[in-house]
């Protein structure tokens, strides 16, 4: 219920949770987690999953209509697939704790340029430092336990920037798994004495992080 102070009783807020059977349930920290959609009594979306599911269904319906016009009557469904490569920065926890801007905003708000940035692209696909490699190995194993098929890790263009690429899957599942991936990244980084920065532009003058 939503205690908004309105005239309607809180138990009549009328939000409905529905299990999303198209996305896998999983166990995290001994808790069964079930992906769900949340909508109002009138059908209005109250979450971010419902619009995604409706968009996928609308795309399927209209794409099938066009395909059938071309005479391909044997096609029964059109599904989108996504494999979002997650970019991130790893920063030593001791260094991170010295920067209040990183702590409070997830990015630097002031500072000087480093002596060397991402010139010559020597960090991109370069040798992975042992500490980072240990983090990546641990991260893979944690994600596999949750059914997230992490496949490829490598250094990205900017210093201390890295990337994880999962095996592609349907758009709805990929969106759920990307949320899990970001959460687990931060937990595993902490175990290795580091902080995982997922802000889209944590440092000025070098590449930001995204999903592509």
Model regions and ranges:
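Short, basic/glycine-rich phosphate-binding loops at helix/coil junctions
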Residues: 203
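Glycine-rich, acidic/polar active-site loops that bind/position phosphate-bearing ligands
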Residues: 1-198, 206-211
